[in-house]
């Protein structure tokens, strides 16, 4: 009985986390991220978590260490 309860709780936690992730990271916005200049390292701050966390048409892109919102390249 205890094993079944633990299994159900783990399954519920997994489903909740998966749903929360899917809602917080909508589909990728059009365009590509600009490439960071060679031998450059941006700040290691995570200023975005996905395209959905950037305003307008901005994309969440790597800056060489962390991520920041950047205008897309087409």
UniProtKB/Swiss-Prot annotation:
Its main location: secreted. Residues 26-73 form the WAP domain. One of its GO terms (molecular function) is serine-type endopeptidase inhibitor activity. GO terms for biological process: antibacterial humoral response; innate immune response. GO terms for cellular component: extracellular space. SUPFAM superfamilies: Elafin-like. Could have proteinase inhibiting capacity. This is WAP four-disulfide core domain protein 18. It comes from Bos taurus (Bovine). The lineage of its organism: Eukaryota, Metazoa, Chordata, Craniata, Vertebrata.
């Amino acid at each position: 009985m205890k094993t079944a309860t633990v299994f159900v709780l783990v399954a519920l936690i997994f489903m909740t986390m998966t749903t929360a992730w899917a809602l917080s990271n909508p589909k990728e916005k059009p365009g590509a991220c600009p490439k960071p200049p060679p031998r450059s390292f941006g700040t290691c701050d995570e200023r975005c978590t996905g395209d959905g966390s950037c305003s307008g048409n901005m994309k969440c892109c790597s800056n060489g260490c962390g991520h920041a919102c950047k205008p897309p390249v087409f």
